[in-house]
From Swiss-Prot:
The chain crosses the membrane at residues 32-52, 78-98. It comes from the Eukaryota. InterPro entries: ASTER. Belongs to the Asterix family. Keywords: Membrane, Transmembrane, Transmembrane helix. GO terms for biological process: protein insertion into ER membrane. GO terms for cellular component: endoplasmic reticulum membrane. Signal peptide: none annotated. This is Protein Asterix. The keyword Transmembrane applies.
Length: 98
């Protein structure tokens, strides 16, 4: 018996992989949002802004590659978000933070 499939209708299988790398400006946006929300949280005394800053900072650090890292780019968002959270919860006027 011969093969009933037609040779012209056979499609070869190929594997599609989704790109998991962050886009071009995504890392800079996480860093920028972390700094902006950190300043807003410290100046306006909003704890929610400080927590958003901390989440953006963690997202920035988790997607950071070794070739993009320098001390200044890592230290700015981390120090600002941590300083704001420490001031909000352990500062002398911590009961004023709403």
């Amino acid at each position: 018996m011969s093969d009933p499939r037609k040779e012209s209708l056979i499609v070869e299988r190929f594997e599609m992989r989704a790109s998991t790398e962050p886009k071009e400006g995504e890392l800079e946006l996480y860093s920028l949002f972390s700094i902006i929300f950190g300043f807003l949280g410290i100046m306006l005394k909003y704890k929610i802004c400080l927590w958003v800053s901390a989440v953006c900072c963690v997202a920035y650090l988790s997607n950071l590659k070794s070739k993009d890292s320098s001390v200044r780019t890592i230290l700015s968002p981390v120090s600002l978000s941590l300083m704001g959270l420490v001031m909000a919860y352990f500062g002398p006027n911590s009961n004023l933070f709403v």
